[in-house]
Swiss-Prot record:
This is Exodeoxyribonuclease 7 large subunit. Heterooligomer composed of large and small subunits. Disulfide bonds: none annotated. The keyword tRNA-binding does not apply. It comes from Rickettsia bellii (strain OSU 85-389). Belongs to the XseA family. It is found in: Cytoplasm. It catalyses: Exonucleolytic cleavage in either 5'- to 3'- or 3'- to 5'-direction to yield nucleoside 5'-phosphates. Keywords: Cytoplasm, Exonuclease, Hydrolase, Nuclease. Bidirectionally degrades single-stranded DNA into large acid-insoluble oligonucleotides, which are then degraded further into small acid-soluble oligonucleotides. GO terms for molecular function: exodeoxyribonuclease VII activity; nucleic acid binding.
Length: 442
């Protein structure tokens, strides 16, 4: 009994606060920053905004505290039964003599939990309209292509090699992490960064790329911040995440989805050789059509010349008829008056009073003369009207008006029309609307 009493006298004595603090220091100093996987149970969110729950595995339980600022950064709702991976620090709570994990980061664990979170997030963002935007067209020949991906690995090399192979152009690389807790934010910041560049340095299209992997590996590309940055980008975005069977939320918000990073490079630029071949085909069609058009217009000019000659002959003929009619009218008037005077003299002075017959015949003659003059005027007006119509038609068909529209007439020294580049004429006279020029062939 004395020994025991002596021993108790030499043992260090602690207050409750002291021993609690010692345990707290022991936990924090020996474990530091750790990761723990388990299932959420007993979740409670206090009015202060802090979350309290247990992380359990079979019969083992670890108390967890998630402070409000950390809880606000978690991008999916917490539920009992959800399997998660928590990063944080172990500590103790002196109020009830228990240790707990202070949460600093929380991610879903297990395929089922991740699929559930993904479906809920997809439905919510789709309801907001983030997947129903009007897709921006991918430029046909971009001067600069922005690539957001990891600077290491085969993806960036595949993209650069494919672009150089098809149509070499300037590539701007924005290196990011494509996996991990903060990679979604990094990629979103890269998209925003490209959009904030000056116009002279801004790419015409952005490729966001990553190689294949599991749903956990590609989880960053389901990040809500990244989806919103993709939706808000003023620059067209091609998403190229994983393989053809892999789909992430960025694919739904991008302007075009490529099944692989190599395919994204193919979407971004055409093949130069094919483009050159297409241009040559277009050139041939253009030359052929132009030659046919020139030939058709040359024939039209020839037809216009024939019509002009016919119209000139027709108008001259009608003018001659008009002149002859006018002369006949003028010549017939004195004869008519003379005839009437002769008839008047033949009447017997005993049967008709001279004064009355003269008055009557004068009146009759006046009416007839007026009628003849009126008929002559109407005939003249009719011919003048027809002459004006024919003149307008002739003017519209005049080849000078054709020259006004940008055509030219080419003649050789012999005066013959030249319609082919194979002519043997050495000196060409080219007639434009406002004058002629002479050209000498080499």
């Amino acid at each position: 009994m004395l020994d025991n009493f002596t021993s108790s006298q030499t043992t260090k004595e602690f207050s409750v606060s002291e021993i609690s603090n010692k345990i707290k220091e022991l936990l924090e100093n020996n474990f530091g920053y750790i990761k723990v996987k388990g299932e959420i149970s007993g979740l409670k969110i206090a009015s202060s905004g802090h979350a309290y729950f247990n992380l359990k595995e079979n019969t083992a339980i670890l108390a967890c505290t998630c402070w409000r600022p950390i809880l606000a950064k978690i991008k999916f709702p917490l539920n009992d039964g959800m399997e998660v991976v928590i990063s944080g620090k172990l500590s103790s709570y002196a109020g009830n003599s228990r240790y707990q994990l202070s949460v600093e980061n929380l991610q879903p664990a297990g395929l089922g939990a991740m699929v559930q979170i993904l479906n809920e997030r997809k439905a919510r963002l789709e309801k907001e309209g983030l997947f129903n935007k009007i897709r921006k067209p991918i430029p046909f020949l971009p001067n600069k292509i922005g690539v957001i991906t990891s600077i290491t690995g085969a993806v960036i090399q595949d993209i650069i090699h494919r672009i150089r192979e098809r149509f070499p152009t300037h590539v701007i690389i924005w290196p990011v992490s494509v996996q991990g807790e903060n990679s979604g934010n990094e990629i979103a910041e890269a998209i925003d960064g490209f959009n904030k560049l000056e116009e002279a340095n801004k790419p015409d299209v952005i490729i966001v790329a990553r190689g294949g992997g599991s749903i956990e590996d590609l989880w960053s590309f389901n990040d809500e911040v990244l989806v919103r940055a993709t939706y808000n980008s003023k620059i067209p975005i091609i998403s190229a995440v994983g393989h053809e069977v892999d789909y992430t939320l960025i694919d739904l918000a991008a302007d075009k989805r490529a099944p692989t990073p190599t395919a994204a490079a193919e979407f971004a630029v055409p093949v130069r050789s094919i483009l050159n071949s297409t241009l040559q085909s277009y050139e041939k069609v253009l030359v052929t059509n132009t030659k046919q058009l020139v030939k058709n217009h040359e024939q039209a000019i020839t037809n216009y010349d024939k019509i002009n000659r016919y119209l000139a002959h027709y108008i001259n003929h009608k003018q001659q008829l008009l002149d002859e009619t006018g002369f006949n009218l003028l010549d017939s008037l004195p004869c008519l008056i003379s005839l009437k005077e002769t008839k008047l003299k033949s009447f017997s002075k005993e049967r008709i009073h001279p004064h009355k017959i003269i008055t009557y015949k004068t009146l009759e003659l006046t009416h007839k003369a007026a009628y003849i003059i009126k008929s002559a005027n109407n005939t003249l007006k009719n011919f003048e009207y027809k002459l004006e119509l024919n003149s307008l038609l002739l003017l519209s068909l005049d080849y000078h008006n054709v020259l006004k529209r940008g055509f030219a007439i080419v003649k050789g020294e012999s005066g013959n029309f030249v319609s082919s580049k194979t002519t043997t004429e050495k000196v060409l006279n080219i007639q434009f609307f406002d004058g002629n020029i002479k050209a000498v062939r080499d």
